[in-house]
Design a protein with these regions (language model features):
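Alpha-helix boundary/capping residues
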Residues: 22, 112, 137, 168-172
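Glycine-rich beta-alpha junction loops
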Residues: 11-12, 146-148, 206-209
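Conserved beta-strand scaffold positions in the cores of enzyme catalytic domains, especially
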Residues: 29-31, 120, 153
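Short beta-strand segments
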Residues: 8, 143, 203
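Phosphate-binding site of ATP-dependent enzymes
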Residues: 160, 166-216
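ATP-binding N-terminal substructure of ATP-dependent carboxylate-amine bond-forming enzymes
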Residues: 1-95, 126-129
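Generic detector of well-ordered alpha-helical packing
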Residues: 73, 144, 213-215
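N-terminal beta-alpha lobe that positions the nucleotide/phosphoryl donor
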Residues: 42-44, 49-61, 76, 80, ...
């Protein structure tokens, strides 16, 4: 019997790729939600998307054998919530948030391989003294603690770059506020509690070979 594999935001291109992998004939790949609504970067309606996903899954008459995704926020954070709800294997929400929250992920990386992690620090972009509180020299990156597709990431080469970047961050950082509702669902470590989507992280430049989790 074929397994029913729900894929959040599945499009035709990726469906063709999935159908070419080994043992694909043993799976029914089922589209869960429209990809264009999920990647609408003007507004991440996470709670609405979860409600629609639950509605579609509840109406399905067959077995739900797997729920996966292949894109960034909000899909990446929807997967663990839906997997837990429907009792299928998947990552925990905490493990995903550790990777998605840029400051938390840097703390985890620093604990595991401190010799390879450059300096970093969180800061409030609405603090007029933020630049003076960053404890390392130029150049460095600043970015929201939650972003996707490299949005709102700025390379700060000198003092004059900082105000320009901060102005844009202050205007647009609210885009990722839905991320805070996910942080409220778990017990955050003391070092991370309070560092929500309104915060940024500054970090020194890192160089080297870059590989994805998939090996690319």
């Amino acid at each position: 019997m074929k397994k029913n594999v729900f894929i959040i935001g599945l499009d035709d291109f990726n469906l063709q790729m999935l159908q070419s992998v080994r043992n694909a004939e043993n799976c029914n790949f089922i589209r869960l939600l429209d990809i264009q609504k999920l990647i609408d970067t003007n507004a991440y309606r996470l709670s609405d998307m979860l409600e629609l996903a639950v509605e579609q899954l509840d109406q399905f008459e067959g077995s739900i054998d797997a729920i996966v995704g292949y894109t960034d926020f909000p899909v990446s954070t929807m997967v663990p919530i839906l997997c837990e709800k429907y009792g299928v294997p998947g990552p925990t929400l905490e493990s995903v948030l550790k990777c998605e929250h840029k400051y938390w992920s840097r703390l985890e990386q620093q604990a595991a391989i401190p010799e390879h992690i450059p300096q970093f620090t969180p800061f409030d972009p609405f603090d007029d003294q933020a630049l003076e509180k960053i404890p390392f020299s130029f150049p460095f990156w600043i970015k929201p603690i939650k972003s996707t597709a490299s949005q709102l990431g700025f390379r700060i080469r000198s003092k004059k770059d900082f105000p320009k970047a901060i102005q844009i961050l202050r205007e647009k950082i609210g885009l990722f506020k839905p991320f805070d509702a996910l942080l409220d669902k778990i017990a955050l470590p003391e070092a991370v509690a309070g560092i929500n989507s309104a915060y940024c992280v500054a970090e020194q430049i890192i160089s080297g070979r870059q590989c994805t989790l998939e090996g690319y």
